[in-house]
Regions:
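Short, solvent-exposed coil/turn segments at beta-strand boundaries
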Residues: 41-44, 90-93, 126-135
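Short solvent-exposed loop/turn micro-motifs enriched in small/polar/acidic residues
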Residues: 24, 79-80, 118-121
Length: 149
């Protein structure tokens, strides 16, 4: 049986206006990320946003945490590029899948830089806060594998 949280998500009403608002905010977020605009990214997030990378235990909370997430990510992978491959937008938020290319030039998630040019697949869920009309963060799922020695 689904939890109350899941039932609430499934029962969220879907309107064209809400869909457009979510899509436009995602576009704003994506453009800010492409432009390395941290303030622009933060403008799309709730103050209590949470960022996670599945399977790593990594977690960043609030605007301070989101700033650290992006600073660390963009330092580790300064040439990171997301090529959108799939997207779903609904009243629960946005789910995207992207092919990511990047060079690993600094420490990321306890992994020292390798200098390797990487190609990986990411799926990212941006949960929507209908009251704030902002995203509540990102849940990142990736097939990134680091060398184990």
């Amino acid at each position: 049986m689904a939890s109350e949280r899941i039932l609430e998500l499934m029962r969220r009403p879907s309107t064209a206006e809400e869909h457009d608002a979510i899509r436009e905010l995602w576009k704003t977020h994506s453009k800010a990320e492409d432009n390395r605009d941290i303030a622009g990214l933060l403008s799309t997030l709730t103050r209590d946003c949470v960022y996670t990378v599945a399977g790593t235990g990594a977690r960043w909370e609030g605007h301070e945490g989101a700033t650290r997430f992006y600073t660390e990510l963009l330092t580790a992978f300064p040439d990171i590029h997301f090529e959108l491959d799939y997207i779903v937008i609904g009243p629960q938020g946005v789910c995207e899948e992207a092919i990511v290319t990047a060079t690993h030039e600094a420490r990321w998630l306890d992994h020292e830089p390798t200098g390797a040019k990487l190609t990986l697949r990411n799926a990212i869920f941006f949960p929507w806060d209908p009251e704030a009309r902002l995203f509540k963060g990102e849940m990142v799922y990736t097939d990134l594998q680091f060398p184990t020695g």
